[in-house]
UniProtKB/Swiss-Prot annotation:
PROSITE patterns: PORPHOBILINOGEN_DEAM. Tetrapolymerization of the monopyrrole PBG into the hydroxymethylbilane pre-uroporphyrinogen in several discrete steps. Its EC number is 2.5.1.61. GO terms for biological process: protoporphyrinogen IX biosynthetic process. Binds 1 dipyrromethane group covalently. GO terms for cellular component: cytoplasm. The porphobilinogen subunits are added to the dipyrromethane group. This is Probable porphobilinogen deaminase. Its cofactor is dipyrromethane. One of its GO terms (molecular function) is hydroxymethylbilane synthase activity. Pathway: Porphyrin-containing compound metabolism; protoporphyrin-IX biosynthesis; coproporphyrinogen-III from 5-aminolevulinate: step 2/4. Belongs to the HMBS family.
Amino acid sequence: MKIRIAARGSKLSLKQVEIVTTYLQAKGYETEFIEIKTKADLFGNKPLHEIGKGVFEKEVNEAVLQGRADIAVHSMKDMSSELPPGLELLATPKRENPVDVLVSELNLEELPEKSRIGTGSLRRANFLKVVRPDLVVENIRGNVDTRLRKYRDHEYDGIILAEAGLRRLGVEVKRFPLDVESFTPEPNQGIIAVVGSPKFLGLFQELNDTGTMKEALAEKETVKVVGGGCHSPLGVLFRLEDDVLHGIASYSNGVKRVTVKLSTRESPQIAGNQLGKALVKAMKDEGLIP
């Protein structure tokens, strides 16, 4: 039997597809890759938060719903909160390191005033403005290779990227991890999602990492409570340790940042809900929302 896999054609997306392909081929399945060009790929210079929620996801899922592919593979951070009817989250392989990193010759404290920092993320831009308001935040788009080329061509003094993407691509570049309190990662950063018909649930059982799935569901629940998609200035991270979910959520308008934390043995849905409600309360208390 052949399984057709829909995904974007970027180098990072292909690395993620490779993980799923290797798993399926080891189980004796043939695989076929269906490349999908999304609206976000076509509007390469626009900031991501201006294009809209679920922008990398919609067309890829449509290929499955229309029968052109059997499953879709996504960076889970690019997915909107709800999947369309007929599709389910089938598996989340083990999560890669979820932190943000500063690619630069100098760490964040050492960078001189007015250093130009490139990011295409409103969340990263706002968090950076709180920590180092004296730096110049500039929009950057393109895949990881393009961003690194622009950095190496001295268009920027530093760029902020996800550690997970650099690791999956095997990129060796000087970089500094950013602490999760000041730069709480994007919800589901470092997680790959396999999406498709519920009939495939059994097939992907062994690929699924239950700890990663719990973290993913808790983070999604927080996003649902707070509102805002993958391009809002919201950071959420859960880590599962000894059956305890440890969560942190942060929101910033570029002037103030609020951060809340919790640890609980409750289900991912309850944990995410509680963290989301705590963040909304903190945002109201600080006057970030009415």
